Amino acid sequence: MEIRQHEWLSASPHEGFEQMRLKSRPKEPSPSLTRVGANFYSSVKQQDYSASVWLRRKDKLEHSQQKCIVIFALVCCFAVLVALIFSAVDIMGEDEDGLSEKNCQNKCRIALVENIPEGLNYSEDAPFHLPLFQGWMNLLNMAKKSVDIVSSHWDLNHTHPAACQGQRLFEKLLQLTSQNIEVKLVSDVTADSKVLEALKLKGAEVTYMNMTAYNKGRLQSSFWIVDKQHVYIGSAGLDWRSLGQMKELGVIFYNCSCLVLDLQRIFALYSSLKFKSRVPQTWSKRLYGVYDNEKKLQLQLNETKSQAFVSNSPKLFCPKNRSFDIDAIYSVIDDAKQYVYIAVTDYLPISSTSSKRTYWPDLDGKIREALVLRSVKVRLLISFWKETDPLTFNFISSLKAICTEIANCSLKVKFFDLERENACATKEQKNQTFPKLNRNKYMVTDGAAYIGNFDWVGNDFTQNAGTGLVINQADVRDNRSIIKQLKDVFERDWYSPYAKSIQPTKQPNCSSLSKLKSPSKQPAMANATGREPLSV
């Protein structure tokens, strides 16, 4: 034991440390273990590389998506901006044929047109105007490109002896369809018309309006547009009776594309409802009014400085900048300083439903206001016929009553009774003719005129589709003034033996009627003859 200790102690220090180092050194790994570690390391490196590639791709994808979102948002903003820009300007549709307020014609000719039934006689000096049939045929003969017609009636091809003018008009329309002239027609859906079917087969475009689906009304509009230049508007529809037995009145504008620019939009509005069961919540800007009571069309009519605009009914059919018929009538009455003359078939300020009838004060109240508050003289010429509502006389009595105790309140009412003329006809004449009726629907004042499609009945304005025309003129003394001509027509009818101040009698004086002259013996157009103004 001592010897071994001595031997250990006698060994060199270097030798001892070398042995300790050898004993503490780990064993060398085996080759297989080395390969496993290398493979594991390589796998980790590959996964790390794949993860970095995926992260880079993800970043690129997110960046690309963000760019797409930004681009999409910019495109949407640009589209909205373009829409706003175009909504701020007047877009001219194809139907307007490139017309604008800058290039349209506002120096126009205008003519009153009337249909005076055969056997209706006036005094020698009574004014007469262009016959309605001749005026309509003139328009169709002038047509070169297009004829657009809105009418409440389509009954031209009748077998009655008095329907010959209606048949000629129908034949002319058929002829136009074969001459490469575009014919567009608008009618109420309830019209069961062989005339429309025949014209449709020949190529005419027919639009049926289902007013019942909108507000339980019907179409009563009556106007024409020819070649985007000429216009007719008035009381007459395309009915043979309007060219024979009915007393009708309207106006024709020649070379007046500025008025067409506005009226065409009402025609387009009707056409836009062709396949719709309800009115859109927002109208297209193409249907907005061009002129209204606030912005009237400035034009020359027969070289007379004038203003004009068209109105529409019901309120449901009045897009932005389109005057409602009631508002148009209000503007005419409010501007009157001396007198208001009104000629209508029916005057009945009542709104009726299936269950009740209520007072409708819109026009009746405006008349009372003019009488009482502004001392404007009012004359009402109302047709008397078998459909006259007995309540009409009650409302007339009520109107008259307000003037009994008020100074400077002047109201006179007459009933235009063609039943008297019918009663004086011979048996042979009665067999050949239908009852005659005055269907005029207009108002004239000392500075303006309104010509429309409605009687002054509540339901007409609130439910039915109709169009009105307002004309303002400062100088109404010139015989070329359409307002003076219309005033002369009113006075002619007012002073005729057919107008009575009280409820008409059923026993007419036939001998007095035989002494008067028929308008058929008068020239087609004549100026007013200078009759003294209507006494008030």
Curated annotation (Swiss-Prot):
Residue segments, region Disordered = 503-536
Q: Which Pfam families does the protein's record reference?
A: PLDc_3
What membrane topology term does the record carry?
Single-pass membrane protein
Span-the-membrane segments of this chain are 69-89
| InterPro entries associated with the record | Diverse_PLD-related, PLDc_3, PLipase_D/transphosphatidylase
Residue ranges in the Cytoplasmic topological domain are 1-68
Q: Which residues form the PLD phosphodiesterase domain?
A: 215-242, 434-460
Cell compartment(s), UniProt: Membrane
Question: Membrane among the record's keywords?
Answer: yes
Q: Which portions of the chain have biased composition (kind: Low complexity)?
A: 511-521
Top-level taxon in the UniProt lineage: Eukaryota
Q: Which UniProt keywords apply?
A: Glycoprotein, Membrane, Repeat, Transmembrane, Transmembrane helix
**Gene3D superfamilies on file:** Endonuclease Chain A
Stretches of the chain found on the membrane's Extracellular side: 90-536
- Record carries keyword Transmembrane helix: yes
Q: Hey, which family's this protein in? A: Belongs to the phospholipase D family.
PANTHER family per the UniProt record, alphabetical: INACTIVE PHOSPHOLIPASE D5, PHOSPHOLIPASE D - RELATED
What name does UniProt use for this protein?
Answer: Inactive phospholipase D5
Instruction: Write the lineage as a comma-separated list.
Output: Eukaryota, Metazoa, Chordata, Craniata, Vertebrata
Q: Which gene encodes it?
A: Pld5
